[in-house]
Amino acid sequence: MAMLKKRKHERTEQDCEYFQCYSDVSVHEEMIADTVRTNAYKLALLRNHSSLQGKTVLDVGAGTGILSVFSVQAGAQAVYAVEASSMSQLACQVVKSNDMENKVKVLNSSVESAEIPEQVDAIVSEWMGYALMYESMLPSVIYARDKWLKPGGLILPSCADLFIAPVNDLIVESRLDFWSEVKGMYGVDMSCMQSFARSCIMNKEMAVNLVSPEDVLSFPVRFASLDLNVCTQEEVRNLHGSFQFSCFGSSLLHGFAVWFSVTFPGENSVTLSTSPYGEETHWKQTLLYLDEEVQVEQDTEITGDVTLSPSDINPRHLRVLLNYSIGGGLRRTKQFQMGS
């Protein structure tokens, strides 16, 4: 297996921390064990066989190299697998184990420092993080597109959509109710702990959990879309959209769930969705909790807007600004973060 030479480059402390995370096998185990994710990429590549036959592919953030292997199986003649972490050494072994050394070249480099000797016909990348934008890998894909992708070349996936919906969270409800139940268990009244528990649970940190379809309180709204063929670096640094919901019925509103879908190009296009209405993925859903739960009724209107942007402290981390109004009431604002 040939390892392409790379020029020296500087990495930020945040980049080093990010790439080090991907040297841990558990990260790759979780991703590859996610059959919804992995099969979507495999199927999308195979369905683009006619477009990839004899072509050159760039795999951005190749990890273990599985997408590079899929690309060759789909007919690619040459694949450049760019991986900045030490996992690149294992990607070489994966490629060799599948007898693809003559077609897949692994480059241990960030994509911004990679030296790729030719233009490519397609780019494949699994760049999505929690709430789509956590870890901020999409700018690297755009960089690769602008530098190496031939005019009219393929990007897999080619578009992304973000969704939001109001939700009830039974786990949060149960945890808050627990403190009112302690007296019945031990004869000690600890209901005063409930407000403290609420401030700890419903804080400014985004949570990643599964949401049951029955806990979604209104039809979801798509609040942002990206066309990866044309979107700019500036556009992906500040994703913004508005929402308006009409609640299905009487319930406690604990917050909002955010999820995404990505779609691959082709006549028989493949969509990978992280919706609570679909099969479970390792991304689950991202939850934005209010400061306290609010009672809503049938047809209660909820309006507002949401903005996703990189953290000022660490651009790999995510910041979400939420503005909302419930039942025509006071407009409230809450800022969330993901990452320390």
From Swiss-Prot:
UniProt keyword rRNA processing, yes or no: no
SUPFAM superfamilies named among the record's database cross-references: S-adenosyl-L-methionine-dependent methyltransferases
BP term (GO), one: negative regulation of ubiquitin-dependent protein catabolic process
GO cellular component, as recorded: nucleus
Coiled coil feature spans: none
EC number annotated for this UniProt entry: 2.1.1.319
Chief location category: nucleus
Active site location: E126, E135
Catalytic activity from the UniProt record: L-arginyl-[protein] + 2 S-adenosyl-L-methionine = N(omega),N(omega)-dimethyl-L-arginyl-[protein] + 2 S-adenosyl-L-homocysteine + 2 H(+)
Annotated PANTHER family: PROTEIN ARGININE N-METHYLTRANSFERASE, PROTEIN ARGININE N-METHYLTRANSFERASE 6
Family affiliation: Belongs to the class I-like SAM-binding methyltransferase superfamily. Protein arginine N-methyltransferase family. PRMT6 subfamily.
Biological role stated in the UniProt entry: Arginine methyltransferase that can catalyze the formation of both omega-N monomethylarginine (MMA) and asymmetrical dimethylarginine (aDMA), with a strong preference for the formation of aDMA. Preferentially methylates arginyl residues present in a glycine and arginine-rich domain and displays preference for monomethylated substrates. Specifically mediates the asymmetric dimethylation of histone H3 'Arg-2' to form H3R2me2a. H3R2me2a represents a specific tag for epigenetic transcriptional repression and is mutually exclusive with methylation on histone H3 'Lys-4' (H3K4me2 and H3K4me3).
Name used for this protein in its record: Protein arginine N-methyltransferase 6
Organism: Xenopus tropicalis (Western clawed frog)
Origin organism lineage: Eukaryota, Metazoa, Chordata, Craniata, Vertebrata
